[in-house]
């Protein structure tokens, strides 16, 4: 059976492959090879730029350009060659080293220093920096832009519906009204916090040898400050330096990275469920799309499938990323290999994220507020005005205001007329009575509109 989108084991590479395309060049095995090649090349160039390493003279402009070209022009043919070499070495990082030694054969200047490719490095020196570059690239070029799209869409809902009143529900029961826009603004604010946290998250790397102590480095060049050298190299890649590690970078930052994504996703899961519920309550209508079918047997159905799809995929994403966050920071003694196979799944959870984010945006695009229904529902729940009435009664010193409103309203459907009669009997200033009598469930929305306008 030939591998295709129909025969792929994972739906990420099958049914949903078009939705995860931006991640493929980053987190595929091709992507990992590409970043490994880049790290190996930059390490060789760093050695050549160091005067104390006389065995690697400074590279000519031509040699540096040749090396830069290997990185910039890395392609699938190159990746296939690395894979071919690995069939012999049974070691993926060593295959990259041998590939580079092959690649430089036409440049005598580089051939003369070929044994300094991968000099003093353990495989994890190359791998951890590659993984850091993968996550940094994915964050800046894919994840944060996707988050911004979602935030923009929900912000649009907040602004568009900021004045449309909504009967709130606490514990599923009628509560003080809000507006549709204000409920969207609550979500936007939460998402923006997570955006900033991921944007500012540290992405760490190390290059310090087999157990983190520069043993091999110092055996060859004891007079070089390898600790400083390591910092210079790691930061030159745009990565923050971790000065204290075992053989592996301990991956705490990866746990922090994915924890941030999980928090963002959890907010979106709640958002999906709330919109699902609002649709069920007829607060929102869904625009139909010609040709779409909601049920194989019930022709009338227009299901909230996009929010359901998003919720399901975010659950998968969070499960994968939570495991990464819990497993990766644990490694026996100076290292064990359990992280290796797990790290090959860095992009899996993020792939499910992309599917989910697209589904939520699609669901939002179909939404249309059912304002007549919202107003009707508010008009059937005059008891929500018990709160402002008893609060004003407290101001004017009326005895047992809460208890009197509780007796009138608790567990009852109260009419407008009953509320007006209750207000009329209150011993409060006439202007306050008039203010309360003008109040309706639809206008008792507090500062909802102003809060939306202050969101930015």
Feature locations, PLM:
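Glycine-rich cofactor/substrate-binding loops
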Residues: 1-34, 62, 85-86, 90, ...
């Amino acid at each position: 059976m030939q591998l295709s989108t129909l025969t792929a084991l994972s739906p990420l590479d099958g049914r949903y492959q078009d939705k995860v395309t931006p991640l493929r060049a980053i987190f595929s095995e091709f992507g990992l090879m590409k970043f490994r090649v880049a790290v190996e090349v930059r390490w060789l160039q760093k050695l050549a730029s160091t005067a104390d390493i006389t065995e690697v003279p400074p590279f000519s402009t031509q040699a540096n350009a040749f090396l830069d070209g290997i990185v910039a022009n890395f392609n699938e043919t190159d990746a296939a060659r690395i894979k071919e070499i690995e069939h012999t070495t049974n070691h993926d990082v060593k295959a990259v080293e041998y590939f580079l030694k092959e690649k430089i054969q036409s440049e005598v200047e580089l051939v003369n220093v070929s044994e300094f490719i991968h000099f003093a490095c353990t495989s994890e020196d190359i791998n951890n920096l590659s993984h850091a570059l993968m996550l940094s690239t994915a964050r800046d070029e894919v994840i944060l832009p996707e988050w911004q799209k979602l935030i923009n869409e929900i912000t649009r809902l907040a602004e568009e519906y900021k004045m449309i009143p909504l009967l709130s529900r606490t514990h599923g029961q009628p509560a003080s009204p809000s507006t549709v826009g204000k409920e969207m603004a609550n979500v936007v604010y939460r998402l923006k916090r997570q955006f900033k946290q991921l944007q500012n998250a540290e992405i760490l790397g190390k290059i310090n040898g087999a157990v983190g102590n520069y043993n091999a480095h110092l055996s060859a060049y004891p007079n070089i400050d390898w600790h400083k050298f390591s910092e210079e190299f790691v930061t030159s890649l745009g990565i923050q330096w971790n000065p204290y590690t075992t053989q592996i970078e301990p991956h705490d930052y990866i746990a922090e990275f994915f924890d941030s994504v999980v928090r963002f996703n959890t907010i979106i899961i709640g958002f999906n469920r709330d919109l699902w519920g609002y649709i069920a309550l007829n607060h929102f209508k869904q625009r139909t799309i010609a040709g779409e079918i909601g049920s194989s047997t019930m022709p009338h159905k227009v299901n909230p499938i996009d929010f359901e799809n998003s919720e399901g995929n975010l659950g998968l994403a969070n499960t994968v990323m939570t495991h990464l966050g819990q497993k990766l920071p644990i490694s026996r003694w100076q290292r064990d290999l359990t992280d290796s196979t797990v790290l090959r799944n860095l992009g899996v959870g993020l792939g499910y994220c992309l599917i989910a984010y697209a589904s939520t945006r699609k669901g939002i695009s179909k939404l249309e507020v059912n304002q007549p229904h919202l107003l009707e529902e508010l008009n059937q729940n005059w008891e929500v005005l018990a709160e402002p009435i008893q609060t004003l009664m407290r101001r004017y010193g009326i005895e047992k205001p809460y208890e009197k409103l509780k007796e009138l309203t608790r567990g009852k459907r109260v009419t407008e007329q009953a509320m007006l009669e209750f207000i009329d009997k209150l011993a409060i200033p006439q202007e306050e009575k008039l203010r309360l009598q003008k109040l309706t469930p639809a206008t008792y929305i507090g500062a909802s509109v102003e809060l939306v306008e202050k969101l930015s």
